[in-house]
């Protein structure tokens, strides 16, 4: 029989996405002993790094208020959503990852295939994104990069053109790492200056650095004297990874504990009261006890839900799922 170790916390958060890390940080900041349990890589890394609220209305708060009765988002007051978004922007600014946007006004960003995505808050590196098909933009792509399609964009945007730079790397992560080197950035800017770009804006796939994208984009804009913006690539995306790293680092700074790569394999109850979750690492089970539990496992991609032919199942507590 396996030996089970027991660890006590005030709150256990299950899931390491935006919701889980934000909740954990807020609680740890209040002085509670918080643990976050996750199976591994967060699906935030697959995202654009943008924060969507409700894309059906130009004003996302009005969009939420207009959702059908019974929709869970209708239960959240607009003032609370506004406060949460403002708090998120302040916390990300603390981590040198500034976000642009207004809780009461949706915006559009250009995607890797030339379509427009409606969102609420964007990394500031996307703030200057084209807003319609008529804008004059020059796209700079990178030799061998498979997660970005400039020809799709120029097919949809009649005033767009593109050039290709050989970064000596062909993955989003590899190119982003190169941009952290000042000599590489200087060579890239010199090459761009020689292009004599005449369009109003410059677009680049979202590879402008691992952690220093804000600073890198400011340097390029200063030298080329026009707005520069990142376009999210096909997942995995650097803006999503930057967001995840900022949230995770902030959570740890506030004193939060992370059980990384620890799938929850069971739940311990006393009647209807949950007292602990059983998590496993390298075949060794650990009972993680807490006074409260927050479920933030997401939906299908993150493993929070499983879809079968007739049913959808919640995988940790077997909670009812309403479809």
Predicted regions and their residues:
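Helix-loop-beta segment of a Rossmann-like dinucleotide-binding subdomain
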Residues: 73, 125-145, 164-166, 170-175, ...
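Dinucleotide-binding Rossmann-like beta1-alpha1 core, especially the glycine-rich loop
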Residues: 52-145, 152-161
């Amino acid at each position: 029989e396996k030996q089970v170790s027991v660890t006590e916390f005030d709150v256990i958060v299950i899931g390491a996405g935006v919701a889980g890390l934000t909740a954990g940080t807020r609680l740890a900041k209040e002085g509670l002993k918080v643990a976050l349990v996750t199976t591994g890589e967060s699906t935030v890394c697959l995202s654009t790094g943008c924060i969507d609220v409700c894309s059906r209305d130009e004003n996302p708060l009005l969009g939420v208020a207009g959702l059908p009765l019974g929709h869970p988002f209708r239960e959240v007051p607009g003032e609370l959503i506004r406060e949460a978004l403002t708090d998120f922007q302040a916390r990300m600014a603390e981590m040198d990852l500034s976000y642009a946007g207004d809780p009461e006004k949706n915006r559009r960003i250009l995607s890797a295939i030339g379509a427009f995505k409606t969102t609420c808050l964007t990394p500031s590196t996307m703030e200057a994104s084209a807003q319609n098909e008529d804008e004059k933009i020059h796209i700079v792509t990178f030799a061998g990069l498979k997660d970005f399609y400039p020809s799709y964009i120029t097919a949809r945007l009649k005033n767009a053109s593109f050039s290709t730079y050989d970064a000596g790397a062909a993955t989003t992560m590899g190119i982003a790492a190169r941009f952290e080197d000042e000599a590489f950035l200087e060579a890239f800017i010199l090459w761009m200056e020689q292009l004599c770009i005449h369009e109003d804006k410059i677009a680049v796939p979202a590879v402008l650095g691992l952690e220093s994208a804000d600073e890198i984009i400011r340097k390029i804009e200063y030298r080329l004297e026009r707005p520069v913006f990142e376009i999210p690539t096909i997942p995995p995306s650097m803006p999503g990874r930057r967001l995840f790293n900022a949230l995770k680092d902030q959570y740890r700074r506030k004193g939060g504990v992370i059980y990384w790569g620890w799938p929850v394999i069971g739940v311990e109850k006393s009647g209807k009261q949950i007292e602990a979750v059983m998590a496993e690492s390298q075949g060794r089970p650990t009972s993680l006890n807490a006074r409260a539990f927050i479920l933030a496992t997401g939906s299908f991609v993150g493993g929070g839900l499983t879809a079968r032919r007739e049913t959808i199942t919640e995988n940790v507590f077997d909670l009812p799922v309403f479809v």
